[in-house]
Amino acid sequence: MRPLGIPVLRDRIVQEALRAILDPIYETDFRPCSYGFRKGRCTMDAIAVIMSLTNSKQRYYYVIEGDIKSYFDTVHHRKLLSILKKRIADKDIIDLIWKFLKAGVMEDGLFARTETGVPQGGVISPLLANVYLNEFDKWAEKNWQLTPYEQQKRRKAGLGNYRLARYADDFVILSNDGIEGVKQAKQEVKDFLENELHLQLSEEKTLITHINDGFNFLGFHIQRCKPEGRWVVHLRPTDKGKERVKGKIKDLTSRSWTWMDEYIRLTTLNAIVKGWSEYYKHTSLLEDIEEITRFTWFRYLGWLLKKHKGSRKHTLIQAKTKTIHNRTRWTAEIREGAITLDTYQWLPTRKELKRSKYMQKGRNGFQHPYLPDENSETPPMDYPMGETGPDESLYTATIGATSRKSRNEPLEMAELKLRVKMRDGYKCVRCGSTEKLAAHHKKGTKSH
């Protein structure tokens, strides 16, 4: 069992205030390959990127399934603080984070010190965990994030390219390299995590898998198949995920719950089926969703018979299917009305994932969640004469984040442009305008 360090209400308020301050700062530093615990990102963003890389055009067929041993329990405190100090100069903030890390946990009524790890259950813990592994993201980007020309050059030389997709402490590395190159990359990842971040990869769970054999990530099983003479990548729920939701349904339809009203019970089951189906609505085969719906329905019918001691005559008149608004539904007519279990055969399949918002975000880049959309016309705020808005520094500190051309601009270049604008008083040196400022070379180069 993992020790949980759930803070009291007062500490949670302080942690949330601290998170609200630090999150916009580190959102600028976080790399595009990170998807977990970030505003505006979700598991399907990572899945969409993986699906686009494993097609017949990209051919990233080898996958390194990364598994860090007890990540949240083994984060090195002093290493984490050294990373935080690169961006946080306020000593009081650093001291406060240190106290949160050293708060300890209660196990069986006894206090236990926390020498390593971030307290699971804390409001700020996901952010700190992301800050720590952002060093891994930057290392991967430095080594593997190449221009299209550099990638093509490596392919012509018989070498492969690599892409990292990370969600919290779960990550996969996809490659179009040969097996020997992939093995070497796995060793390099292991060495970096051990030497730089004091983390251990699980040898049993960190595997090298070919896409034809399939792998699990974020509750999905991704596998390349040839069902109709053409290679396609299938996206399906994992067997473990299906068994988990079936276990919940079994518990809710057991004999111990027969005292509950029929309508309330089916409302609860509908919520479970709907939530599960919504998460897996982009799967390749809807048979998986139909399987869960059918399982839920017949478990519910069995529960009704248990509730009324098998007397179908007085309780269950008939069970049938009908179509309402192009949705197939199972309906049981019970006493004074009908009870309906929603089925989700109408949900879009994996083919629609290509046109979904997830793929669009992957192609066009992610908008910085704390900056206005570049296409929106947000009117400027009015401030008293001589004062500037409280978010002025935040906006200028993330120069380039709102333009498509420079959204992936290195942090060093953004900071250089910020210093130039500060030097010139946030005014254009030619016309004196203070709007839509852009930093350029004093003397134009061939590329500008």
Language-model features: locations:
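Histidine-centered nuclease catalytic patch
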Residues: 404, 429-448
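Non-catalytic terminal/accessory segments
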Residues: 1-426, 435
